[in-house]
Curated annotation (Swiss-Prot):
Its EC number is 2.7.7.19. This is Nuclear poly(A) polymerase 2. Monomer. Forms a complex with cleavage and polyadenylation specificity factor (CPSF) subunits CPSF100, CPSF30, FIPS5 and PABN2. Disulfide bonds: none annotated. Residues 564-575 have a biased composition (Polar residues). It comes from Arabidopsis thaliana. GO terms for cellular component: cytoplasm; nucleus. ATP binds at residues 103-105, 115-118, 171, 232, 241, 250-251. A motif (Nuclear localization signal 1) lies at residues 487-494. Disruption phenotype: Lethal.
Amino acid sequence: MVSTQQRTDDDSSQPVKASLKSYGITEPLSIAGPSAADVKRNLELEKFLVDEGLYESKEETMRREEVVVRIDQIVKHWVKQLTRQRGYTDQMVEDANAVIFTFGSYRLGVHGPMADIDTLCVGPSYVNREEDFFIFFRDILAEMEEVTELQPVTDAHVPVMKFKFQGISIDLLYASISLLVIPQDLDISNSSVLCDVDEQTVRSLNGCRVADQILKLVPNSEHFRTTLRCLKYWAKKRGVYSNVTGFLGGVNWALLVARLCQFYPNAIPSMLVSRFFRVYTQWRWPNPVMLCAIEEDDLSFPVWDPRKNHRDRYHLMPIITPAYPCMNSSYNVSQSTLRVMTEQFQFGNTICQEIELNKQHWSSLFQQYMFFEAYKNYLQVDVLAADAEDLLAWKGWVESRFRQLTLKIERDTNGMLMCHPQPNEYVDTSKQFRHCAFFMGLQRADGFGGQECQQFDIRGTVDEFRQEVNMYMFWRPGMDVHVSHVRRRQLPSFVFPNGYKRSRQSRHQSQQCREPGDEGVGSLSDSVERYAKRKNDDEIMNSRPEKREKRASCSLHTLDAASPDSSGITTSGTPQIGIVPGPRAECLVTGDLVCNVTSLPNVEVEAEKFISKITELRKFSQYEHTSGSEQILEVDSRALVQSYHDLAEPVAKHVRPDLSALLACEGGQNKEIGHDMGSESINDTDTQHLPRRLNVNEDVDEVEREAKLGEIAGGVLWNGHCGRNLDHEGFVTPANLDSAVENRNLHSDGLFKSGLPEELQSNSLLSGTGKLDDGARSESLQNEMMRHVFLQPIIGLCKS
């Protein structure tokens, strides 16, 4: 029998009006209930979610429950078998037990069709993880016909066994606790289960413990579930749902929504969705989001505390788990991904304001983010393997290191080159070999002045990323990775729906003279033909006469022809970046000029023809005008990446909301917050983007509270001494404490006093004006041997 901890709906009958119980560490922002307009919008939202297929059928729900029961039976039999083999008494064999718990979206009740089930097996102390679970139990699963795609991940932050059982994806963790016999009614929320266990076991147990605490700390679980289901779908549509890539995962979104439910205990989902974007657009990161006080315990496990733990000070978007030991669930967030999420929150806030004015429908909020139209420059990471099984393991490893590439680029460019990793993978079905591709958008960070043409070097950055990836413990022949720079017009066709790229108005006339196959996969000779055509067209059209010609007085080298057996995928206009045998990896992009330096011993005939054609094109001039063409150059053994100031088009317009004009459809009275909060001033020029106030008498209280949200986000005064409970949501954890001092928001003990600054402004970490303070640190903490190449920058970012 599966543990009684499984998801129940006993709390779904909670009344709309919140009880007298207090939720969260602060008073709510508003206790008002929904208006008639809110109820109407809520019905429309729920209908939209059903029409989008976010709910599974009753048959599939029953099938999932049967699978969980079956897995519970399997682990019980496994533990009894181990107990007998180790010579325990018959009574011990009879009492031997293991219990299956669920967590994640399934436990919270927000899973959709085809979603996986996160499960935890809790076993006795004599059954270990390393041998008994990942070897003996794995062999049992491998012999079962119902089990497919079995993949143990032993080196993960939380070790997991991944497989499909009767077609349903299962993520199974294991935790061995200090009990000889596991009771069937084990209370996993009791801290005693954490006695005498290692940190990996604590992390495994905390998935279930956190899920239980979340459901206990929200005023209305059904409203929480609907809102969370909605916002998870929104995050996937907007490309910001992925913990491994540096965005937010399921537990992160659940904690953000739960905190919002505490702010508005009587709000219904349509209100909560709108207020989600309103609140988190104004939130002053890195002030933490917490559902309850951070408690310490005699077990002495480390808890999130930036005063004591040096590494906690570098967390950019702390979202703290409510179960002991409290941790930051969003430590993967980087400066670049925080910028992307902030822009998407602003997009959602703008759309929700228009929905409240009946100018937009809910479908507008869930528009697919057009990632491949947002930037001019991308990095393409191609992952190859010999067979499907190898690709599954290799792809997971490369994806887990993809976040490190973002951090390294931020580090080596001093935060001036921002990255936007795309969580999804793409496959070219026309290829015979096993592969997939990941992409990353590149954009110059806002707020950096200086030279009109500033250069950075990411050649060594890519090389360092390659070296780390190749340290994979389970590497096998055929596993390879290639990194390429591609411009928007050179993107391969397989990244677009049905292989079709939407038509787009070109910025320059020279871009209008393209061959139809410019975005697809082509040979080196095709690149030469397109190069010659673009060059001739540019000379005729004279599209950019004001631009200074670029010198190309460098010796030529060859680029090895791509094949599944050697170097991998070569896309038209896509030079290889350092993922080739030989010396250091090279990556060069100079405006429209894409260059790559390689030195290969075996020169293909086709490559020789390519060189000769390029040489002929250069004979008439030592200077030449380039437009999106590729050249193979050697530039003083250094490589360049240069692009223009308008590298990317804005994802969403930065709008600072006029809080005095925000629409709040509340029908009741608001309770006053019992402590003083500093107000904010908003630029009048920004008010044109927001709706006008409709009902001043009913809405003014909530508007004032939201205007003072900074007190909750960052303004609770700490008296300078440490108690047993860290019960404030406002301690200082910025990666750059200097910026906080300049804003005069710090006491001598390093804590925020007055919350938000006088004006809503970009976080210094987003604008890039703050120090990085070792922002590229990973869990393994890179040492001082890391290279900093920004002293001799080679990436040019020029104003157009």
